[in-house]
Amino acid sequence: MAITKKCFAAFVLILLFVMPFVYCSELDNTSGFEIKQEDKCYGPEPCKNGYEGCLFFCVRIAYYLYGECTMKPDHQKHCCCVTK
């Protein structure tokens, strides 16, 4: 079964036209101008060592981008880690 040049060219053009739409449909529902980040807060223990303790906790234990100590309603600083 021989594939002619016209059939091959049509197949390649269809692939080039369809592939961008398949790739774009797999992305999340962001507008393109924002990065989806999520915070996850843990107890106050990592913040007892200051900012560096929270940062070390988030990177080493939880594998997040970074961490920061934030004041919560219970008037204690909790270690909140930010994900991608």
Curated annotation (Swiss-Prot):
- Recite the UniProt keywords alphabetically: Antimicrobial, Disulfide bond, Fungicide, Plant defense, Secreted, Signal
Coiled-coil parts of chain: none
- The disulfide bridges present are C41-C81, C47-C69, C54-C79, C58-C80
Q: Where in the cell is it found?
A: Secreted
**Where this protein primarily resides, as one coarse class?**
secreted
Mind telling me what this protein is named?
Putative defensin-like protein 114
Q: Which organism is it from?
A: Arabidopsis thaliana (Mouse-ear cress)
In which family does this protein belong, per the annotation? Belongs to the DEFL family.
